[in-house]
Amino acid sequence: MGRGRVEMKRIENKINRQVTFSKRRNGLLKKAYELSVLCDAEVALIIFSSRGKLYEFGSVGIESTIERYNRCYNCSLSNNKPEETTQSWCQEVTKLKSKYESLVRTNRNLLGEDLGEMGVKELQALERQLEAALTATRQRKTQVMMEEMEDLRKKERQLGDINKQLKIKFETEGHAFKTFQDLWANSAASVAGDPNNSEFPVEPSHPNVLDCNTEPFLQIGFQQHYYVQGEGSSVSKSNVAGETNFVQGWVL
């Protein structure tokens, strides 16, 4: 009679479980050895019992087989990484391209273009979107206008304050100037009423020449000498006082 089919579940009996582990472990190690010898394969087998005990088999050594495994695994990852990166970039480009086309189409629809292919629901959605954008634009415009008006009010108040300060300064300086002008007029009037005022001596601008004790200016005339030559004779020069138009006297 053959053995019955073994149910694949955990053996609850501890002794039976330990016996089964020992039998199957030995069989597995034997099969690994046979595989390495018959097929010239590099085989490594590592087993841990439920108690944590280690059982191992390596046709060329466990460490050598593990190093070879790591090299093959890392090489496989490095070879697959560029392909995965390229595939990821391609997917990203496809997504961005689709998004760009959608944005371009939406922009054209907002400008009132390419509306022929849109249905009623799409047109209603576009209308609501335009109304919302228009409302937001109006609110922003109102806000900007209010801010500008507030700035103008501030500038108006500042200019009003400056104007008040200038007015006060002008009135103060004008009063001082008027006081100085009155003092000047009073001083001039007092000088005109009393010319002998020692504080403001005034000299005549046009003095009388006859009052000056100066001698008259003396201008002396000059004599003219004529040389008269008669016929056939020579006449010596003569001094003719009456005929020389000699001017004597005091000339004022």
Curated annotation (Swiss-Prot):
Keyword presence, DNA-binding: yes
Keywords assigned: Coiled coil, Developmental protein, Differentiation, DNA-binding, Flowering, Nucleus, Transcription, Transcription regulation
Tissue: Preferentially expressed in flowers.
GO biological process: cell differentiation; floral organ development; positive regulation of flower development; positive regulation of transcription by RNA polymerase II; vegetative to reproductive phase transition of meristem
Coiled coil: 91-173
Family annotation (CDD domains): MADS_MEF2_like
Functional note: Probable transcription factor. Forms a heterodimer via the K-box domain with AG, that could be involved in genes regulation during floral meristem development.
Protein name: Agamous-like MADS-box protein AGL6
Species of provenance: Arabidopsis thaliana
Gene designation per UniProt: AGL6
